[in-house]
């Protein structure tokens, strides 16, 4: 029978509930338990697909094409387990489902209310994860902060959930802040006490407290919080600030979090195998060299907008024993100044995805700089489209070449709308989304990096390379090294006369893992370090299914 864990947060937002949930998933998996992690987000958007990156950060795409919260990326990277649309629930999607049922007459004319109908739908979504994926443990992170009005239906639903499964099959974990007050010279537990009091007023008694702090808890504090918050002293867990999020599972293991959870859920205590994770963290913390990579993006004011990109670079750099130095450059700055001012001296350039015309000419300028100065370059999604625009304007001499997305009147639409997108009106959930196969050309750089003839990657786009320009593209020295299996859609392009120049229409950052760095990011880092790419060992990717 599946067990259930609920992770709530108190005192402040962005306290790290997602990392705690992902870390616990890793600790349970290291003991041989299968895990699925679910995120309940209290915003009314149906999904984050149409939200501004400045407000929400990255939209993480699952293998089955769901546009989800960036925390699902943490869940996948920490547990090596693919998530799906079942693992992402928002207030908007809950209300949409309930209203659709009401319109169909499913409630037989009854008055539809938050309790019981909304809370029942929330509980059903949690049960569905257990029923469809059959994990040993389902971990559910509740977004927001205890006390927020938006989170109340979710908190009420998880209170009711105890009645569904029984007390022995459920655990509540509350992540809270224990701040250091410089003027007093001590840490304060009062915010935690009040947060737990608020949670208990809703009817939820936490079993475990995970205390975020910037230093070790002072003597007697665990006992004090134990007494005031009605948890055992062993269940008061310290989660001290770490230099890397990948240290957190090891820290929580030392604190005994997994053992406490297994005791509460009456599951067998097993010996963890964290050897691989410890080796990865050791690599991360003990580099022998340095590599500097610049990310030229549209949303760099919020680095979380490119979270999976930066983490993928970190995975690849650590696997090469290198300390990654990231330089963030706003693409718009390159439109107004000399690219050399921003890009001189870097070892590699990444141009990631985005939407809309703003900053695109800056991305094109960065790619031209990489091409002219033989700097290793990797383009992702819009980054590939910008590479094609650079080719058209600056190599093929097609004046005014552009994407039809940015200039519908361009004389040379080298990037065009996918045929199936022609009549699409709605924005949310209507792009080419999720895992798609890609055929790799033999003898290409892509084939050397992947070591496969067919690969599967995740997509999120409406526009593609315009095949009317493919012959001219090939004649000018470029290579189409990856296509859809029917050869119609261009998925990867590269420039053979460059040390490392490759761009893809998909999002490889969504499948990179600490123990499985993505081949394209590994190749970029190796090239940036001056390594011989003929010696690249193809990196296996985790198997995925839809």
From Swiss-Prot:
EC numbers: 6.3.4.2
Residues that bind ATP: 14-19, 71
Enzymatic reactions: UTP + L-glutamine + ATP + H2O = CTP + L-glutamate + ADP + phosphate + 2 H(+); L-glutamine + H2O = L-glutamate + NH4(+); UTP + NH4(+) + ATP = CTP + ADP + phosphate + 2 H(+)
Residues bound to CTP: 13, 148-150, 188-193, 224
Ligand binding (UTP): 13, 188-193, 224
Record-level GO BP terms: 'de novo' CTP biosynthetic process; pyrimidine nucleobase biosynthetic process
Region annotation Amidoligase domain: where it falls in the sequence: 1-267
UniProt xrefs under Pfam families: CTP_synth_N (PF06418), GATase (PF00117)
Ranges of residues in domain Glutamine amidotransferase type-1: 292-534
Keyword Metal-binding: yes
InterPro entries: Class_I_gatase-like (IPR029062), CTP_synthase (IPR004468), CTP_synthase_N (IPR017456), GATASE (IPR017926), GATase1_CTP_Synthase (IPR033828), P-loop_NTPase (IPR027417)
Binding annotation for L-glutamine: 54, 354, 382-385, 405, 462
UniProt-annotated binding residues for Mg(2+): 71, 141
Active-site residue numbers: 381 (nucleophile), 507, 509
Record's keyword terms, sorted: ATP-binding, Glutamine amidotransferase, Ligase, Magnesium, Metal-binding, Nucleotide-binding, Pyrimidine biosynthesis
UniProt pathway annotation: Pyrimidine metabolism; CTP biosynthesis via de novo pathway; CTP from UDP: step 2/2
Record-linked CDD domains: CTPS_N, GATase1_CTP_Synthase
Family: Belongs to the CTP synthase family.
Functional summary from the UniProt entry: Catalyzes the ATP-dependent amination of UTP to CTP with either L-glutamine or ammonia as the source of nitrogen. Regulates intracellular CTP levels through interactions with the four ribonucleotide triphosphates.
Subunit comment: Homotetramer.
Any further remark recorded for this protein: CTPSs have evolved a hybrid strategy for distinguishing between UTP and CTP. The overlapping regions of the product feedback inhibitory and substrate sites recognize a common feature in both compounds, the triphosphate moiety. To differentiate isosteric substrate and product pyrimidine rings, an additional pocket far from the expected kinase/ligase catalytic site, specifically recognizes the cytosine and ribose portions of the product inhibitor.
Protein name in the entry: CTP synthase
Organism field: Synechococcus elongatus (strain ATCC 33912 / PCC 7942 / FACHB-805) (Anacystis nidulans R2)
Lineage, top ranks: Bacteria, Bacillati, Cyanobacteriota, Cyanophyceae, Synechococcales
């Amino acid at each position: 029978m599946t067990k259930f864990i609920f992770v709530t947060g108190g005192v402040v937002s962005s306290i790290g509930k997602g990392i705690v949930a992902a870390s616990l998933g890793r600790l349970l998996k290291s003991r041989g338990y299968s895990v699925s992690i679910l995120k309940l987000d209290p915003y009314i958007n149906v999904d984050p697909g149409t939200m501004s990156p400045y407000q929400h950060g990255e939209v993480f795409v699952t293998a089955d094409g769901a546009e989800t919260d960036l925390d699902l990326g943490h869940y996948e990277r920490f547990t090596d387990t693919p998530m799906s649309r079942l693992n992402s629930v928002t207030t908007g999607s809950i209300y949409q489902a309930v209203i659709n049922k009401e319109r169909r007459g499913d409630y037989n004319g009854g008055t539809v209310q938050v309790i019981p109908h909304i809370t029942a739908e929330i509980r059903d979504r949690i049960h569905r994860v257990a029923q469809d994926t059959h994990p040993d443990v389902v971990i559910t992170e509740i977004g927001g902060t205890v006390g927020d009005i938006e989170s109340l239906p979710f908190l009420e639903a998880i209170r009711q959930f105890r009645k569904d499964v029984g007390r022995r099959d459920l655990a509540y974990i509350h992540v809270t802040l224990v701040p250091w007050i410089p003027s007093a010279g001590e840490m304060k537990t009062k915010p935690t006490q009040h947060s737990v009091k608020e949670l208990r007023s809703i009817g939820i008694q936490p079993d475990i407290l995970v205390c975020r702090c910037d230093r070790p808890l002072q003597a007697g504090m665990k006992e004090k919080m134990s007494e005031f918050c009605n948890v055992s002293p062993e269940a008061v867990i310290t989660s001290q600030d770490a230099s890397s999020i990948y240290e957190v599972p090891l820290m929580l293991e030392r604190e005994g979090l997994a053992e406490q959870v297994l005791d509460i859920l009456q599951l067998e205590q097993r010996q963890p195998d964290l050897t691989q994770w410890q080796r990865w963290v050791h690599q991360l913390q003990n580099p022998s060299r340095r590599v500097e990579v610049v990310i030229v993006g549209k949303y760099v004011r919020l680095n979380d907008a490119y979270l999976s990109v930066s983490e993928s670079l970190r995975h690849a750099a650590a696997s090469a024993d290198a300390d990654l130095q990231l330089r963030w450059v706003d693409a718009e700055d390159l439109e107004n100044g000399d690219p050399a001012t921003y890009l001189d001296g870097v070892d590699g350039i990444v141009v990631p995805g985005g939407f809309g015309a703003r900053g695109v000419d800056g991305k094109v300028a960065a790619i031209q700089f990489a091409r002219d100065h033989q700097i290793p370059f990797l383009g992702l999604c819009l980054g590939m489209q910008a590479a094609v625009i650079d080719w058209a304007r600056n190599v093929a001499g097609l004046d005014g070449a552009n994407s039809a997305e940015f200039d519908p009147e361009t004389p040379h639409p080298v990037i065009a709308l996918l045929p199936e997108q022609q009549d699409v009106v709605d924005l949310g959930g209507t792009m080419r989304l999720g895992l798609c196969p890609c055929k790799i050309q033999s003898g290409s750089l892509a084939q050397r990096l992947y070591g496969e003839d067919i690969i599967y990657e995740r997509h999120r786009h409406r526009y593609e390379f315009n095949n009317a320009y493919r012959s001219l593209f090939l004649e000018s020295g470029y290579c189409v090294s990856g296509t859809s299996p029917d050869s119609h859609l261009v998925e990867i392009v590269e420039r053979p006369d460059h040390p490392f120049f490759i761009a893809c229409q998909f999002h490889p950052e969504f499948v990179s893992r600490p123990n499985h760095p993505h081949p394209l990011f590994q190749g970029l880092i190796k090239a940036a370090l001056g390594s011989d790419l003929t010696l690249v060992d193809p990196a296996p990717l985790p198997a995925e299914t839809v």
